[in-house]
Curated annotation (Swiss-Prot):
Pfam families: ACPS. This is Holo-[acyl-carrier-protein] synthase. One of its GO terms (cellular component) is cytoplasm. It comes from Rickettsia felis (strain ATCC VR-1525 / URRWXCal2). GO terms for molecular function: holo-[acyl-carrier-protein] synthase activity; magnesium ion binding. It is found in: Cytoplasm. It catalyses: apo-[ACP] + CoA = holo-[ACP] + adenosine 3',5'-bisphosphate + H(+). Transfers the 4'-phosphopantetheine moiety from coenzyme A to a Ser of acyl-carrier-protein. Its EC number is 2.7.8.7. It is an enzyme of class 2 (transferase). Keywords: Cytoplasm, Fatty acid biosynthesis, Fatty acid metabolism, Lipid biosynthesis, Lipid metabolism, Magnesium, Metal-binding, Transferase.
Amino acid sequence: MFIGVGTDIVQIPRIEKILHLYPELFAKKILTSKELAQFSLLDKTGHAVFLAKRFAAKEAVSKAFGVGIGQGINLKDITILNDNLGKPIVEVSSNYTKKLPPFNIHLSLSDDYPVCVAFAVIESSCNVISR
């Protein structure tokens, strides 16, 4: 069963400006510990794109759930990782998912400076969704 679809676009220069003002604070505010571990391995030149893609992805996933960030789900409730081939994998905090039936999240990320885009589709095998 289809639950929802969400998309988000982020201007990479906007993230670059934020990083210039708050180099460590912004990453710690939006990334989970697993994402911060990946982030710390990157060269600084890749920081803005990494953060822009993660922010867009989290917004897209929250929109697909039909709630939006801060409206029942927070940035740190969503973790975006990659499998061995680079495919995005989404993990959602059990604090949020305990109210939901089993679901799958499909996520696509792309960037072409100065923008990045995220597209998320959420599906469930159950017929009823309670929030």
